[in-house]
A protein has these predicted regions:
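Glycine-rich, charged/polar anion/phosphate-binding loops
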Residues: 25-34, 75-81, 133-136, 164-169
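Single conserved hydrophobic/aromatic residue that forms the stacking wall/gate
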Residues: 1-8, 12, 200-201
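A glycine- and small/hydrophobic-rich beta-loop-beta segment
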Residues: 50-122
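Gly/Ser/Thr-rich beta-alpha loop segments that engage phosphate groups in nucleotides
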Residues: 5, 38, 52, 125, ...
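Acidic, glycine-rich loop-and-beta core segments that form the ion-binding/anion-interacting portion
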Residues: 17-73
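Flexible, glycine/charged-enriched surface loops at secondary-structure junctions
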Residues: 29-41, 75-92, 118-125, 144-146, ...
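Internal helix-turn-beta structural module
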Residues: 106-109, 113-199
């Protein structure tokens, strides 16, 4: 009987790379949305040819590699969104205060995928009402009276009602190529971030 096997250390290294890739994909490529669709051909490939000569011999080495790989994957994921056809605005939707990770994720994805929200951004309309509406139907149990929303660093909503920031200031703040929407559910310690863009008529 003949066969080919690899050393246990090689198996371990492949497992480390696989875990690092899985972790990186979770916080990068799986955190972007353009039109809400996904291709059956969507693929992430990481190739390691050993040419660098770098060796991962300690937990600290592995952690440093994981962080570096995650950074590269996140930047590539952002570029996918930024390179979308006829993109006018790149928007980061950051949800905090979730009671569970899934709760924060559902809220962030609902806002980032909402056609109404995305079209308002294209028209330089902050429209926090559409944002809180998307959070409300996201499928997670949220308390509207606890929700705070900041748009481009300005308070748009506090406790589920309009904040004191003048509407003209909010409208001016979103007239930029990129900005962030911060949504605090004020229910827990979990957070989630999704990267998206504005929606225009084709």
């Amino acid at each position: 009987t003949q066969g080919v096997s690899s050393a246990a250390s090689d198996v371990y290294k492949r497992q480390v790379l696989e875990l690092c890739v899985q972790s990186g994909v979770k916080s990068s490529f799986n955190c972007i949305t353009i039109d809400g669709d996904m291709s059956t051909n969507d693929t992430v490939l990481v190739m390691a040819n050993g040419a660098s000569g770098v060796k991962l011999e300690t937990p600290e080495d592995i952690y440093a590699f994981q962080q570096a790989l995650a950074h590269v994957m996140l930047e590539l994921a952002k570029h996918i969104v930024q390179d979308g056809e006829r993109v006018t605005k790149f928007v980061t939707v950051h949800v905090t205060g979730g009671r569970t990770e899934d709760e924060a994720k559902k809220a962030a994805e609902a806002v980032a995928k909402s056609s109404l929200v995305k079209s308002s951004w294209n028209g330089n309309d902050p429209n926090w009402g559409r944002i809180i509406h998307a959070v409300g139907y996201c499928g997670a149990k949220v308390d509207e009276e606890k929700i705070d929303i900041d748009i481009a660093g300005l308070a748009a909503c506090r406790g589920g009602v309009q904040a004191d920031t003048p509407s003209d200031d909010l409208r001016q703040a979103v007239q930029v190529p990129a900005f962030q929407v911060d949504i605090n559910l004020n229910r827990g310690e979990f957070s989630h971030t999704v990267y998206t863009l504005s929606l225009i008529h084709i």
